[in-house]
């Protein structure tokens, strides 16, 4: 769990998402309004996210779950009621953005990850006034929920660099790069710039 003090929960969550190996993610919040607001904020930060709540039609909820299954989105922001019945094997993380009102809801939430024999991770944000609920959850699950440190900005930066290198390696393996070579040569000739500068751009 992370002590939700100081930096915002949104910043804490995005840093965790960027520093860890994540696949599909379900983020649990308490209100329908927050599902929409948080999904929009995650989208603005470059994540593929969609809300799912009780105000949405059954058809739209099912389509959102299908998008998560088929890798069209990576994050679903959900209320407890709307998340019932979600069974997606690729969910690697459940993030309890808002602590649940009762221990049973917590057990249902974390049961959404680690499906089909895969490893799963659950992260819980706990404000100081919510420590009693944390203790109740530990008692009900008979597990100690350990505190976590947020990834440093340096760790996030290193992770981004590694991901960028991996995307370059993938492009080198799969693509016909001759079109880009021709384009760089054209830019060098037309703009009279150094080849390495054109390639870096």
Question: Regions from the language model: what does each represent?
Answer:
Residues 1-43, 182-186:
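Conserved interdomain hinge at the start of the Helicase C-terminal
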